[in-house]
Amino acid sequence: RNFVRELNGENRVACFVGNFIAEKYVDQGHLGAFLTEADPAFYGVPSARYEAACASSSVAIDAAATKIRADEYDVCIVVGWELMKTVESRVGGDYLGRAAYYDKEGRGIDLPFPKLFGKLADETLKKYPDLDERRYMDALAKISVVNYENAKRNPLAQTRKWFMSYEEATHRGTES
């Protein structure tokens, strides 16, 4: 029984895919149409990919909800995925640098996002000179440790075996 095709009898079903940069990590670009690889039932169902860096899947959900509220579709299938462990970490960091202003903040910079976040922390301390730097940096380190711990609880997380100690999280690199 083709449930998707039955649902879409009046063209009231659509698919929304959230993904940042599959073109680089898995050499696959047109992800909306790629759903037909999961099930041929998706042939003929309108689909599109939504990209907004770390918010790609959230944007896909918002787009689907907007289409339902506008009464354009009755059912929206939303899929979000990333596969980022297909390359070594420095190459992956370069790929992720494309979520920033690449020519200025990503190109040729090893692991650009930790460095960008560090610069943001430095700028925050400059902007708010009364902020207790030690307490602020301690809070950021604790957030990092909590994020790693949260990933360990998700059996599907690609990073569940990664580790970040408090000591590692408090280390501030000086290279740009």
Give each language-model segment a name.
Residues 23-37:
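A structural motif shared across PLP-dependent enzymes of the aminotransferase-like
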Residues 5-9, 26, 39-176:
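Acyl-thioester C-C bond-transforming condensing/cleaving domain
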